[in-house]
Regions:
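Short C-terminal alpha-helical element
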Residues: 12-16
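Short, charged recognition helix plus adjacent turn
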Residues: 1-5, 20, 43, 61, ...
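Long, hydrophobic alpha-helical segments
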Residues: 53-56
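Short alpha-helical DNA-recognition segment
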Residues: 23-43
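Short amphipathic helical patch at the helix-1/turn junction of helix-turn-helix
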Residues: 9, 20-21, 50
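Residue-level signal for short amphipathic helical patches enriched in basic/charged
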Residues: 36, 51, 62
Length: 79
């Protein structure tokens, strides 16, 4: 049957760093990402909820970085 896929351990902190580097509040980044509930941003940043692939891609686009930097724990953000 299915196997659990490994989750990036550093994703939450990278999402937080991106928001901070862009100088955006949680409400502001939620609007730019098309997230209805800004509280989800906090949950992503605290590793309570895992963002969807579409949200991860939107973060990468907003930060103008390849998505690999978000999902590969071996890579540091190029910010």
């Amino acid at each position: 049957m299915g196997h659990a896929r490994p989750r990036p351990k550093l994703l939450a902190s990278k999402l937080f760093i991106i928001r901070q580097e862009l100088g955006l509040s949680q409400v502001q980044i939620a609007k730019r990402l098309g997230i209805q509930e800004y509280t989800n941003v906090s949950k992503y940043e605290r590793d309570i909820n895992e963002p969807t692939l579409m949200i991860v891609l939107a973060y990468a686009r907003l930060a103008e970085i390849p998505v690999e930097y978000l999902i590969d724990d071996r890579l540091d953000l190029p910010l």
